[in-house]
Amino acid sequence: MYQIIVSKTAEKFLDKLDSSDRERIIKALERIRVRPERFLEKLVGEKGYKFRVGDYRLFIDLDKGNLMISVIKIGYRKNIYKW
C-alpha cells in the first residue's frame, strides 16, 4: 500500500475548502492507495499525474519504488492548469 504525502501548497488549499469537499478529496486519496495507476492520468507535456475528484484536480508525483504518492498541488479544474 502506498504512503500519501501532501505538500504545504496542497495542504493550504485543503484547509480553505469546506468540510464536505475536503472529506471527499481525502476519501478519494485513501481509495487510490492500493493501486493508484488505475485512477491516475499522465500529464501531457509534464512529469507526473493528475487525479480527478469532482471539479477538483490533484497533481501527483508517483514513486513506485518507494511506494509513495506525493500530492503536489490541488485546485479547481478551470484554474489548476494555469501555472
Model-derived regions: residue spans:
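Histidine kinase transmitter module recognition
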Residues: 17, 31-35, 59
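A short, surface-exposed loop/turn module that caps and links secondary-structure elements
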Residues: 27-52
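Enriched for short, Lys/Arg-rich terminal
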Residues: 1-5, 16, 20-23, 53, ...
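Generic leucine side-chain signal with a strong bias for well-ordered alpha-helical environments
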Residues: 14-17, 29, 43, 67
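Short aromatic/hydrophobic contact patches that present stacked aromatics
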Residues: 11, 50, 59
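Basic, amphipathic "hinge/linker" alpha-helix immediately C-terminal to the N-terminal HTH DNA-binding motif
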Residues: 6-10
